[in-house]
Amino acid sequence: MVAGQVWHTPTQLFSPHYGRALARYLVTEYKLHLFPYHELVMYELGGGAGTLAKDILDYIADEEPDVYTCTRYRIVEISERLAHQQKERLARHVECGAVEILHRDFLQWNEDVNDPCFVIALEVLDNLAHDVVRYSTDDLQPYQGLVSIDHTGDFAELWEPVQDPLIKRYLKLLSNVRPSVLPPGAPVYLSWLPRWLQRWLAEYMPFYPNLTAPHYLPTGALQMMDVLRQHFPLHRLVISDFSSLPDTIPGVNAPVVQTRHKGEMIPVTTYLVLQGFFDIFFPTDFIVLRDVYLRLMGTTPEDGFAAVEPDAGVDKEYTTPASPAAYFTPTYPRAFDNPAVHVASYEDYSRAPDSLFSASDIVPPPLLNETHEARIMSHAEFLARYAEVQGTQLRDGSNPMVSWYANACWLLT
């Protein structure tokens, strides 16, 4: 990494207000749906310096002491250095048993977590691995991209028919949720040109492109969703990331590739750059992400959309919900007046009695009317609803925490 290259996230810039806004959302949803029968369990993917975790836990400890006693915050961190830094920063909450640092790769997770939990991933998707494909202008078949490095260290792209099972599965999911005559990035004229003419142009026309523009696939995000589906059956997602980015390289869902030189950010036009000296950020198509997520969560083995578990079919009975809703809410009991009644795994307490809330609680109505929904919110919309905006308001009335990062969105399930 280039010396002095620092990236500031809203969590860092607006600490503690940004983390407190997320904490208010989490506590609100917890009180409406789980309190007091379950613990508040949270998994944060990639905790960075521990700023978000500290701000969330400080808020709960100071403002919601009853909730804090049953809070379990787990950070899944792949970096040993950051895991050590998080443990030092969160020492107060570690001593109280409210936080646990798990030094591991979430994409390699292999343990079942059957508790209702929130999975938090802020500024994670933009750094996850992507694959790139291009489509033949002859028959629209996809070709996967490979990078070759010669003896001098120069990079070159190679294209071959798609063989990677992860790419195949993502393309199958994408075509299911976004059926289209043309693949992403294909020129519009291919939709009305006869097939014989397409082949003739590809074979005989000088300078006619034989491949479409690159299409970057979020296969790393698909791997993350596989883990959630296989091992976190009662999770709720809290994702925030960039929906668009400036200065991207050519292609569909293409990233920004940039480095710092003499204190100035320099974007480049290719991802074929020297490793360790450039940062690569991918935008997230939140609408496609939501649809792929819901389709994957409601899939069956016969669909061929889900990843095959290593022990699938070996002394393990496979059960799948009939619809995505079953991943979030099996049943909704209404007998609140009888605490002895057995309560299902993920309850709906949106009609809970006032006794569940203290007199000082100001609890917004639930974001999701139906638990199988996945809601996309703008950065400003989420903060206007849950943030204590007076803490970041300037003298002229503007509020940078709300107005900045206009190219960011939230996905909440």
Outline where the language-model segments fall.
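Short catalytic/ligand-binding loop motif for oxyanion handling, primarily in non-cytosolic enzymes
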Residues: 51-53, 82, 127-129, 246-249
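A short, conserved alpha-helix within the catalytic core of class I
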Residues: 104, 109-111, 126-143, 193-201, ...
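A mobile, often basic/glycine-rich helix-loop segment
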Residues: 118-194, 257-262
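Short, well-ordered beta-to-alpha junction loops that form the rim of enzyme active sites
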Residues: 47, 124, 240-243
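Rossmann-like AdoMet
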Residues: 1-43, 49-117, 133, 287, ...
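Beta-strand elements within well-structured catalytic alpha/beta cores of enzymes
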Residues: 22, 119, 237-239
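Long, Lys/Arg- and hydrophobic-enriched amphipathic alpha-helices
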Residues: 8-13, 183-413
